[in-house]
């Protein structure tokens, strides 16, 4: 969600892109919409049910944006996210995958966990380490693109192997 800090809960540009490409180019859901789904949407059994849930998520996401700061929303999202292996939330995931706390994660570890948020099963570092490493590197490239890290850091960290301290 590259525009997380600039949208109001629903990113219509991303939503329009997802509709045009039938969801193949990436989802149109913002972090806030995903949080709304995690907290309030029951599991949909089919595409029609899922389509009917979307407008409700938009309303909830807009309300969340009015009630909470962006940082609070991001924290709620990361504390609700299921990183697999009974690791719900960033604190638990940091322990399960790296035997550390979130504040002590290395950049490559944090990028891997963020990468899992796109699809935890697909980018499961235990079962699919190469996929997880590639996704981590995509996150690092995005961090460089948006100015969070420089090119040298991106290149050096991307070259590192995926190193888990899985418990």
Functional labels for PLM-detected ranges:
Residues 1-150:
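Peptidoglycan glycan-strand catalytic modules in the bacterial/periplasmic cell-wall system
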Residues 150-167:
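Non-catalytic structural connector segments
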């Amino acid at each position: 969600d590259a525009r997380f800090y600039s949208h109001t809960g629903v990113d219509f540009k991303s939503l329009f892109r997802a509709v045009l490409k039938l969801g193949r180019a990436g989802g149109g859901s913002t972090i806030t919409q995903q949080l709304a789904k995690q907290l309030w949407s029951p599991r949909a059994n089919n595409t029609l049910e899922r389509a009917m849930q979307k407008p409700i998520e938009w309303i909830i996401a807009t309300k969340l944006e009015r009630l909470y700061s962006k940082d609070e929303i991001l924290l709620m999202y990361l504390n609700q996210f299921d990183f697999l292996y009974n690791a719900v939330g960033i604190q638990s995931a940091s322990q399960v995958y790296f035997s550390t706390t979130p504040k002590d994660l290395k950049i490559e570890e944090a990028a891997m966990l963020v990468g899992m948020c796109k699809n935890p099963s697909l980018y499961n570092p235990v079962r699919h380490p190469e996929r997880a490493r590639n996704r981590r590197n995509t996150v690092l490239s995005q961090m460089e693109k948006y100015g969070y890290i420089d090119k040298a850091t991106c290149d050096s960290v991307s070259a590192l192997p995926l190193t888990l301290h899985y418990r």
